[in-house]
Amino acid sequence: MKIKLGNKETIHFVGIGGIGMSGLAIIMKGLGFKIQGSDLSFSKNIERLKNNRIKVFLGHKEKNILNSTILVISSAIKKNNPELIKAKKKKLPIYKRGEMLGHIVSLMKNIVVAGSHGKTTTTSLISSIFSFSKIDPTVINGGVLNSYGNSAKLGKSNWCILESDESDGSFLDIPVTYSIVTNIDAEHLDYYKSLDNLKGSFVKFLDKTPSFGKSFICIDDPAIKSISNKIKNKNFLTYGLDRSANFRIENVINNKDYSQFNLSINLPGQKKDYIKKLQLPIIGLHNIRNAAASAAVCYLIGISNSMIKSGLKNFQGVQRRFNNLFSYRNISFIDDYAHHPSEISCVLTSLREVYREKEIVCIFQPHRVSRLNSLKDEFTKCFKHSDYLILCPVFKAGENIKLNFNYKNFAKQIIKNSKVNLVIVNEEKDILKYVKQNIFGDKIVIGMGAGSISNWMRSLEHKLK
């Protein structure tokens, strides 16, 4: 269903403080719509919205939508939300974020980045390459790009680079020109019910690829490999370390300052090509795969090899993705968004590879009880490359669910399976106390999680000093 474009519409975003909702709101404001929204509490995203002259109500109340003509809801909004109930009574058009996003970007040529992990970094890397190519794209990302100071920007070209959200299936509403699927992992099973259903949704997504576009899939990923024969639309190319990849990663170098690799390009009916010594200022094989995907789509679009190299080498990063915060007593403090066992394992493996001589201290805040319940065993095994683990209480993210296991026994299983020294803390101040009393010498301290842990890590600097 198409919406009527025009300045007379007042579009109200319920849950506007989320990273995806705030980004879409900023884009639509730039397109000329009157935008407002509401959320439960103030945040940096709301501060960015206000800087873009978007009105934000704190708290969800019926009166907030008195002048609204359209409602956009985030996937976190419950059926008993007073604004949603009032909108239904008023018979207002109500759209999920993914539906509205699909309507807006249908006016553009889209590069859609999907997958369980690595979407935000991949979207940001493509944006960096475009910027160095003097193409000004619209960008809608799941994280704040350091180069923009925002998660979204309205560009002057007809290109849109966007991160999809598969959590509620609405990523299937987004029109695709080019797409990337980075990997598929056991996430959002509260919605999909099974990994097979999740895989099936990605098959549907890839089958949407038009004849004038192309999809790119990471053939290194076991779940993607398992569905490759089920994709009816064969208009896709592969990337990865696998020898069969159309865009094959070779000669990998990883150190604490940068990553480097070559890209061997083997396309049907075309002469073999190479892009040598691709460098990026972030570490880890997972990020090299993200960079390969970014290079692949830009190469096929027609961006020059030199511009691809420049865009990757000068990448300015994304907030909450392996951010070096500060140093204290020769200890480096890092903030990272990793909150799934696969992500945690990738980040810690990368750290261990480039900092072999240092001890690694991980401060982990589990995000969502539902995720911890469904992936309990995987969480006990993902800290093997950490020497110490500070385990925080679960950040519930609004969930009213109970753990189906004993937390102290869970900690004991982590010690057993990950061979790590572990301490449980009950609140933020306990982290400060433990670090002051126990963390000395040449160490790396990394905070991990998608909740309040990022703010906790940032507040440590002035509290320690």
Question: Which residue ranges define each predicted feature?
Answer:
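Nucleotide phosphate-binding/pyrophosphate-handling subdomain across enzymes
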Residues: K2-H12, G20, L24-L31, I180, ...
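C-terminal helical cap/extension that packs against the catalytic core
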Residues: T380-G441
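Short acidic low-complexity segments
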Residues: K55-N67, D430, V435
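Phosphate-binding loop of NTP-binding sites
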Residues: K2-L5, F13, G20, I27-F33, ...
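Beta-strand->loop->alpha-helix junctions that form or flank phosphate-binding loops
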Residues: S38-D39, F57-H60, Y95-E99, I140, ...
